[in-house]
Structure formats: C-alpha cells, structure tokens
Amino acid sequence: MKIMKIFRHLIAAGCLIWVASTEAQSWVTPALPAIPDRVYPIADFGAIGDGVTTNTAAIQAAIDAAAGAGGGTLEVPAGVFLSGPLRMASQIRLRVDGTLRMLPLGQYPGGTTDPANFISGANLHDIALSGSGSIDGQGAPWWPYAKTRGAKRPRMISFSSCERVLIEGLLLTNSPMFHIAISGRTCDVTVRGVTIRANASTDPVNPSHNTDACDVTGKRILIQDCDISVGDDNYTCGGGTSDVLITNCTYGYGHGVSIGSPTSGGISNFTVIHCTFNNTDSGIRIKSDRDRGGLLQRLSYRDLCMTNVGCPILIYAAYMATNREYRALNSLTPAIAATYPRREVTEKTPIYRDILFSNVTAMAQPGRRAGLIWGLPEMAVTNVLLQQVTLTADKSLGIYYAQNVRMVDSHIRTPTGVNPLDSTHAQVLVTPP
C-alpha cells in the first residue's frame, strides 16, 4: 500500500541540530607533504624529452637517487618524456613542467595482460606531483578493452595507504583507466588546481569507460579548484572515508560526484560546496547495495549549480540489482519500487542518514527526472533536508522508502506543476520559507 505523509508546518529548531553539526565540520585542511629542497633534474640521469626515447630507467634512477639521499624534487622540464611504469618513494616531489607521457599500448610493459600502474606507491609518506605541465596517458587505444573479458588497463596515478599526498597544478589527460586512484589507509590528501580530461562515455567515436577522475578513499581529503570532464565518476570514494571537502570545482562529462558503491566501513563528514556541473550524467550520486554497505552520515551538498545533467540528485541502495525494472532508475515508479524484496538487516546493510542539500539549482536533461531518493524496505533513508533547492525536470522527484525527508523553501518544477512527488513508503515534510 502506498504510504505518503505530507506535513505543512514549520520544522522545530531541534530537528536541525544535525544540519548545524554538518556545517560546522565542513572545512578540511589536510597536512601537506614535507619535502627537502634538493633538486634532481631528470636530464642529469639521461632522460631525453624528444617524444621518442623511452625514459623509464632514467626517471626511476632519479627517483631512487633522491630517495636514497632523503628526498627531494625531480624536475621534468619542457619537452615530451616517454616512460613506462614508475615507482614513487617517500619525500619525493615529481615536478612536471613539460609532458610526461605513458608509453603507448603496443610498448607498455604487461600490455592488457598485467600492466603496472604508471605512477604508483604504497605505504609512503610526503609525496607530491605538481607543476605547470601535463601527464598524458595515451589512453584511446586502451579504452575499447573495457569490453574485453579479462583485459586489464593501468591507472595513471595510484597510491595506497600513504600519508600526506599533494597533486597540484597539472593537466592529466586520457588515462587508460582511472586518472587518480588513492585507497587503503590513506590520510591527508590534497588535489588542487588540477585539470583532468578524457572522452565522455557517450562519445560516438571512442568512448572512454572507467576513466574516473579522482577515486580517493581515506581521511582528510581536499579536492579544490579542479576542472574535470571524463568518462566515469568525476569523484568517488569507498568505505572508510571521512572528512572530505570538495570545493570550487567545475565538472563536465562524467558520472558526477559519487559515493560508493562499496561503503563498508562507513563514510562521514563529506561536503561538496561551490561547484558547477555541466552535462554530467548525474550531479550528486550516492550508491551502495546489500552486502557492501556501511553507515553513511553527515553528507552536505551546498551552493551547487547544475545545467543539463542526467539526474541532479540520485540516492539509492540497489546499485547491484539484477532485475531490469529496478535498474531503470529514470522510469522507476512507486509501484515498481514497492515490489523491491525485503531482506534481513545485517552488518553490511547500507544505512543513509543526515543528508543536506542547500542552495542547489539544477536543470535536468530532457526526459529525465528531477532526482531519486530510494532506500531499502528494511532500511529507509532518513533525515534528508532540501533547503532552497530548485530542480527543473520533465519527470518528478521519486522518494521511496525514506523517512523524515524535509523540503524547506524548495521547488520541484515539472510540466505537470510544482512539487509533484512520486513516493511510496515515504514520509515527506514540505514547509514554506
């Protein structure tokens, strides 16, 4: 049976305590790497920037020499420096002012069978990639292998369980797979002033798949002043992530700012503020599923502008659903959502609560819905506040299996009117300014 409650009254001040708590914790200042002043020009180790010479051994020798002396900065000057996989070390800065280019598919060690990631490291501390230049992944020939069973593709930058990581100022283009992948027990990560480009996943000639821009899981993460357009998630993180701030970023093609789908270990104190989205498949996407879930709480999205996005707000816990009617999110109806089977609650059940959207304006793509908030029959999404939010779309906002969803001075505009809500098993409170 459809359960829908709409209350039109002022929300008691006590109900907004969690919102104030979220805003108070929103600013994140990660510790920056401490790197000695010593400089190591890679040309001193035999590197040649002619776009033809393979410089893997020379650049690795420079990294190893700097690490052996206690750290320093490697200089990649003007020119095009081809290289295979490189292993970073602690207290090393790789400053790229020219172009550092991955070897092409036909020459890259391991090919599609066992390729190492391009720039990688694990259990390191105080590492930086910066400069005014670019890192080019030459990814186009790799991208079709996304559909080849068993084929592997290298990531451009991959760090695991590292402390104090800085990526700043660079242009990252056309990675074979993820551009920045940081995982494990990592803490204090700053990605600032970085531009990331790859073809859209809908490109008619050569779509790029799984070319995520920033997959950064850990604690104390700042993504600031970045310009990103890729073929997959513009940002995403997994479980075990806390204290994240994404601010002043511009997003083009891609799947938006995402959380999940693996969320075991929980995600908390996550803030996105002062960002724009143009032509993204989704704006904000929170995704998980049974058997890979955790507690997601204190998520804040403020001062966002979205134009021609596929789905401005997408929150759901059925990411791995196999039934086609449950996967067709744009056409999901209350009647279909109400048939989603209930399961027993376990420690891996996704829990979504305390989510704020404030001062968000979005225009969806033609034929798309304003958004979707879809919990599980056994675990509803709880405490969602839409405050001064205006969503314009051809289809309404769907709210299924959700409790205490509050709309304050907010408007869902569709051809059928203002604030049409498709809902089932939901409690929605609509209040004036």
Labelled PLM ranges:
Residues 14-17:
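Repetitive helical segments and hydrophobic/amphipathic motifs
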Residues 24-433:
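Extracellular/periplasmic carbohydrate-active domains that bind, remodel
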Residues 2-11:
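Bacterial N-terminal signal peptides that target proteins for export
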Residues 19-21:
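N-terminal signal peptide c-region/cleavage motif recognized by signal peptidases
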